């Protein structure tokens, strides 16, 4: 348990393979076993219906234009681990070029997106939100394309969900995750 977060502490945590969550004002660090990842190779799967949505250009995808708003939208649910303190600290990481958002816009309004932390060749996906069908899914596809182009090695989703499994996300043992993390942290990648 930690009382306060700082950008430096977050960076240290991600480099160790742990991540924080706020529970009732207390910050706890997690290191799940197994750990979920999304493959950045040919195993990443996009359904044919989502491919059609992408081809129709239903959404305009933007990167890093509404980071704080993306985090705020991710926090607006019945149960959340994203406190205002988290929004402040991750926004500092964003200002330093280490936290990023992918936003789906429609008719001038942000209707979905995601955010996470990029550290060397690791991208730790933190949360997604959507108020328009497929908006966050299209944002995730755009994220994977961006990570591939930038030379990222590892897309950490922390936990598996049925939603992420449709993209090919899978679980690996903690020890295997730590090995992949070491390799990812040794490479240079650009968001």
Curated annotation (Swiss-Prot):
It comes from Herpetosiphon aurantiacus (strain ATCC 23779 / DSM 785 / 114-95). It catalyses: N-terminal L-lysyl-[protein] + L-leucyl-tRNA(Leu) = N-terminal L-leucyl-L-lysyl-[protein] + tRNA(Leu) + H(+); N-terminal L-arginyl-[protein] + L-leucyl-tRNA(Leu) = N-terminal L-leucyl-L-arginyl-[protein] + tRNA(Leu) + H(+); L-phenylalanyl-tRNA(Phe) + an N-terminal L-alpha-aminoacyl-[protein] = an N-terminal L-phenylalanyl-L-alpha-aminoacyl-[protein] + tRNA(Phe). Functions in the N-end rule pathway of protein degradation where it conjugates Leu, Phe and, less efficiently, Met from aminoacyl-tRNAs to the N-termini of proteins containing an N-terminal arginine or lysine. Keywords: Acyltransferase, Cytoplasm, Transferase. It comes from the Bacteria. PANTHER family: LEUCYL/PHENYLALANYL-TRNA--PROTEIN TRANSFERASE, LEUCYL_PHENYLALANYL-TRNA--PROTEIN TRANSFERASE. The keyword Transmembrane helix does not apply. SUPFAM superfamilies: Acyl-CoA N-acyltransferases (Nat). Its EC number is 2.3.2.6. It is found in: Cytoplasm. It is an enzyme of class 2 (transferase). The lineage of its organism: Bacteria, Bacillati, Chloroflexota, Chloroflexia, Herpetosiphonales. GO terms for biological process: protein catabolic process. GO terms for cellular component: cytoplasm. This is Leucyl/phenylalanyl-tRNA--protein transferase. It holds the Pfam family Leu_Phe_trans. Belongs to the L/F-transferase family. GO terms for molecular function: leucyl-tRNA--protein transferase activity. InterPro entries: Acyl_CoA_acyltransferase, Leu/Phe-tRNA_Trfase, Leu/Phe-tRNA_Trfase_C, Leu/Phe-tRNA_Trfase_N. Gene3D superfamilies: Leucyl/phenylalanyl-tRNA-protein transferase, C-terminal domain, Leucyl/phenylalanyl-tRNA-protein transferase, N-terminal domain.
């Amino acid at each position: 348990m930690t009382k306060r977060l700082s950008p430096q502490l977050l960076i240290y945590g991600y480099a160790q393979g742990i991540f924080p969550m706020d529970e009732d004002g207390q910050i706890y660090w997690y290191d799940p076993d197994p750990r979920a990842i999304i493959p950045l190779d040919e195993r990443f799967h996009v359904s044919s219906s989502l491919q059609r949505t992408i081809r129709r250009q239903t959404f305009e995808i933007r990167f890093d234009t509404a980071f704080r708003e993306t985090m705020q939208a991710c926090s607006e649910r019945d149960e959340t681990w994203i406190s205002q303190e988290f929004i402040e600290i991750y926004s500092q990481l964003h200002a330093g070029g280490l936290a990023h958002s992918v936003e789906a816009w429609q008719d001038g309004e942000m209707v979905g997106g995601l955010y996470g932390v990029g550290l060397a060749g690791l991208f730790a996906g933190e949360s997604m939100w959507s108020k328009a069908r497929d908006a966050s899914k299209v944002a995730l596809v755009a994220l994977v394309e961006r990570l591939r182009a930038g030379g990222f090695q590892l897309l950490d989703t922390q936990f598996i969900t049925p939603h992420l499994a449709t993209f090919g996300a899978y679980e690996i043992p903690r020890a295997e995750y730590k090995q992949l993390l070491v390799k990812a942290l040794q490479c240079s990648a650009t968001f």
